[in-house]
Curated annotation (Swiss-Prot):
InterPro entries xref list: GGa_phosphorylase (IPR033746), Glyco_hydro_13_cat_dom (IPR006047), Glycoside_hydrolase_SF (IPR017853), O16G_dom_2 (IPR045857), Sucrose_GGa_phosphorylase-rel (IPR016377)
Physiological role: Catalyzes the reversible phosphorolysis of glucosylglycerate into alpha-D-glucose 1-phosphate (Glc1P) and D-glycerate. May be a regulator of intracellular levels of glucosylglycerate, a compatible solute that primarily protects organisms facing salt stress and very specific nutritional constraints. Has a very strict substrate specificity. Cannot catalyze the phosphorolysis of sucrose or synthesize sucrose from Glc1P and D-fructose.
EC number of this enzyme: 2.4.1.352
Recorded consequence of changing N275H: 38-fold decrease in catalytic activity
GO function terms (MF aspect): glycosyltransferase activity
Organism: Allomeiothermus silvanus (strain ATCC 700542 / DSM 9946 / NBRC 106475 / NCIMB 13440 / VI-R2) (Thermus silvanus)
Keywords: Carbohydrate metabolism, Glycosyltransferase, Transferase
SUPFAM superfamilies, A to Z: (Trans)glycosidases
Annotated protein name in UniProt: Glucosylglycerate phosphorylase
UniProt temperature dependence: Optimum temperature is 42 degrees Celsius. Retains full activity after incubating at up to 55 degrees Celsius for 10 minutes, but only 35% is left after incubating at 60 degrees Celsius.
Superkingdom per UniProt: Bacteria
Primary enzyme class: transferase
């Protein structure tokens, strides 16, 4: 059983005092009870060059008569063992909307997907990242249904606002009303709903909410999670009259989660998901020891898209050259694609407004859709909805397929070259086209990037070695295997960004273990002043990169 050391107790009490004032000692007592009932875990933590995570839904692959989690595990084990060290399994809990992110019950597995046993089996062979959807619950959840019945236990679980309250300073991530009216026996109540009327925000000013969420966090750890993704964590603490984004209360809650995990499961890593400009994003590292160990690298996808749109890596290189980590116990979670669209807000301050507008135009020209958010100046684009393959190459153009594949792989070599742990969305393994049928059927733009496969459909694609899916899966698997063998790609290995325009030039590692990473971001051959062995091809590199070719060079 786990217990808190005097030092941990004092640190926890300090943060609880900030959040709850004189109630803090009582909350600490409850927290100690929760921790004392948790079996102490001491496993290997940290990270290495061997780490890469696949991002996928639990029902990504369907086979008739088989729970999707078992079908997924079979695919992971047969195709990707030794390629990926871990899996980010998107929310696998009962949910009513938002493809899993309107959670009904934090501590149950959706029976349509499988069971906790299926989750634990995946976690035995792959390092599991689970989502803690910490900002909100489904309007159909027992908590909110209790609130709607005026159950005293749940009256403080949600945020209600009086009519006429000035909320003009609140940051809005969506072009939807912030408040949703609900009828209760005691009358109509205006409830805070940041993301949608079906996603009711939790009230962390009530310590009971914090304790329930920490119980959910430990449930995931108990069932094998080695990483916890803190979904939309920047929104969790509200103070009227502020932006209600990235407030000190949110950071205190992350610090509390870190302290609890340090006490009971120090191998578990926190990953903050804050789709925000870089400065706010990296604030969730805290001092490098007291908040999240990993932070999502949200500027990377729009910057890579800009790089290949212009054939110029200078903006990407300039941004990457300024990246620093506060300690060796932190690193970046790098990604180019995920279940969401390509967010353009994080590129603000790096790209000019007209450059962001050009990305929006390209997405539309390539068959994508654009989601907007509300601002005082009206709706503005925040997300481009289409697959990464289609974002980089126009699916309607007569450009050669092999050139499109080369461009796509070059973009992903950038992902694998940069300092951090790479997360690879499952559709990036196949170069999937946008799912227009899924969008038309649902009306949900993000469904363009969320196609679910039947097992037979996927196997048919991969059985043809000349297919796009087979070519990209083979190439990507090779890249990840090569990467895992070289300490220069350790998430904390040194990184130098060299002057870059048509070729992105990165040096990882140092001394005789250094690797020069060169990625041609144009459709023309480029010359680089470096020769040596190309780890990707296994052949001697003589200094000329073909269009969209990448090379990892050692002396």
């Amino acid at each position: 059983m786990s217990s808190l050391t005097p030092e941990l107790r004092q640190s926890i009490l300090e943060h609880l005092g900030f959040l709850y004032g004189e109630r803090a000692p009582a909350v600490l007592g409850r927290l100690e009870e929760i921790c004392s009932g948790f079996p102490a875990q001491r496993r290997e933590g940290g990270w290495s060059e061997k780490d890469a995570l696949l991002i996928t839904y639990g029902d990504q692959i369907h086979a008739e008569g088989e729970p999707p989690l078992q079908t997924l595990y079979d695919f992971l084990y047969e195709r990707l063992r030794g390629v990926f060290s871990g899996v980010h399994l998107l929310p696998f809990y009962p949910s009513t909307s938002d493809d899993g992110f309107s959670v009904v019950d934090f501590q149950r597995v959706d029976p349509e997907l499988g069971t906790w046993t299926d989750i634990r089996i995946i976690a035995q062979d792959f390092r599991l990242m689970a989502d803690l959807v910490c900002n909100h619950v489904s309007a159909s959840s027992p908590w909110f249904q209790g609130f709607l019945q005026d159950d005293p236990q749940y009256q403080g679980f949600f945020i209600t606002v009086d009519p006429g309250t000035d909320l003009s300073t609140v940051f809005r991530p969506r072009a939807l009303p912030l408040l949703t009216p609900f009828q209760t026996p005691s009358g109509e109540k205006l409830v805070w709903t940041t993301f949608s009327p079906d996603q009711t925000d939790l009230n962390y000013a009530n310590p009971e909410v914090l304790l329930e969420v920490i119980e959910a966090l430990l449930c995931y750890v108990r069932n094998g999670a080695g990483l916890i993704r803190l979904d939309a964590v920047g929104f969790i603490w509200k103070e009227i009259g502020t932006s209600c984004m990235h407030l000190e209360g949110a950071h205190r809650i992350v610090k509390l989660m870190r302290l609890v995990l340090d006490a009971v499961a120090p191998h578990v890593l926190l990953v903050s998901e804050t789709n925000a400009p870089h400065r706010e994003n990296i604030s969730y590292f805290g001092n490098g020891h007291d908040e999240a160990q990993l932070v999502y690298q949200f500027p990377l996808p729009p910057l890579v898209m800009h790089t290949f749109r212009t054939g110029d890596a200078s903006k990407l290189a300039g941004w990457a050259a300024g990246l620093t980590l506060p300690s060796e116990r932190t690193t970046f979670f790098n990604f180019l694609a995920s279940h969401d669209g390509i967010g353009v807000v994080p590129a603000g301050g790096i790209l000019q407004p007209e450059e962001i507008a050009a990305l929006v135009r390209q997405a539309l020209e390539h068959g994508g859709r654009v989601n907007h958010k509300d601002t005082p100046d009206g709706p503005v684009p925040y997300e481009l909805c289409l697959t990464l393959f289609d974002a980089l190459s126009n699916p309607n153009s007569d450009e050669a397929e092999d050139l499109k594949i080369a461009r796509f792989l070059a973009a992903n070599v950038i992902l694998l070259s940069l300092q951090g742990i790479p997360g690879v969305y499952i559709h990036s393994l196949f170069g999937s086209p946008s799912d227009h049928a899924g969008f038309e059927e649902s009306g949900i733009p993000r469904r363009l990037n969320r196609h679910k496969f039947t097992k037979a459909e996927l196997e048919e694609r991969l059985a043809d070695p000349a297919s796009r899916a087979a070519k990209i899966l083979a190439a990507y698997s090779h890249l990840l295997r090569v990467r895992s063998m070289h300490p220069a790609f350790h998430p904390n290995a040194p990184q130098r960004i060299l002057p870059s325009t048509e070729v992105l030039r990165i040096v990882r590692g140092e001394g005789d273990q250094a690797v020069g990473c060169y990625i041609n971001v144009t459709d023309r051959p480029q010359v680089v002043s470096r020769i040596g062995k190309n780890l990707i091809t296994g052949q001697w590199f003589t200094g000329v990169l073909k269009p969209y070719q990448a090379a990892w060079i050692i002396d």
